[in-house]
Amino acid sequence: MEKKKGISMAVIKRLPKYHRYLQELMENDIDRISSKELSEKIGFTASQIRQDLNCFGDFGQQGYGYNVKELYNNIGNILGLTRDYNTVIIGAGNIGQAIANYNSFNRLGFKLKGIFDANPRMFGIKIRDIEIQDVEKLKDFVKENDIEIGIICVPRTNAQKVCNELVEGGIKGIWNFAPIDLDVPKDIRVENVHLSESMMTLVYLLNHNDVK
């Protein structure tokens, strides 16, 4: 299976949805499924699904469809879920704690190694047996523990400073929950989760019927 060059971000963002739904099929002991059946369940057209998957190889068989387990494993491999990623959370407030306690991350290979906060009253408190540390120790911790992913859950005013510490520590990717677009070097990958923007999109959809 060889990844083709120039895969669009739209295709990449659809892959996790395929992966999640295929897992549900396996949990229900469903062994195979057609692109048409996938289309009806996921909401993308059958043609779109086939085009997406063809970007990475030929997975289906005409007249048979897709082997669910095989496709699940192939998509997991494409997404990079075949190894572990050492991860830290910065910001031990409500969002940070919710992420730390989300068990599926560990199953997917995201290994939480450290939690950091700026509030001294939080230091030493444990979440999932991991003690919250002073954010001033972040850069050295990232360097010493081969941390690849930093999850930023701090207020907007502190987010860029935290980001800079992560970058200086050698981080490779940032999952950003702060309502700010971070300034990072070109080789650092950032995935933003701006909750207020998602809510505003929902409000628009509640008030308009012009979305195709």
Curated annotation (Swiss-Prot):
Entry-linked Pfam families: CoA_binding, Put_DNA-bind_N
UniProt-listed SMART domains: CoA_binding
One GO location term (cellular component): cytoplasm
One term of GO molecular function: DNA-binding transcription factor activity
UniProt DNA-binding region: 17-56
GO biological process: negative regulation of DNA-templated transcription; response to redox state
InterPro entries reported in the protein's UniProt record: CoA-bd, NAD(P)-bd_dom_sf, Rex_DNA-bd_C_dom, Tscrpt_rep_Rex, WH-like_DNA-bd_sf, WH_DNA-bd_sf
Keyword tags: Cytoplasm, DNA-binding, NAD, Repressor, Transcription, Transcription regulation
Residues annotated to bind NAD(+): 91-96
Cell compartment(s), UniProt: Cytoplasm
HAMAP family reported for this sequence: Rex (MF_01131)
Homology family: Belongs to the transcriptional regulatory Rex family.
Primary role: Modulates transcription in response to changes in cellular NADH/NAD(+) redox state.
Record text on subunit structure and interactions: Homodimer.
Protein's recorded name: Redox-sensing transcriptional repressor Rex
Upper lineage: Bacteria, Bacillati, Bacillota, Clostridia, Eubacteriales
Gene (UniProt): rex
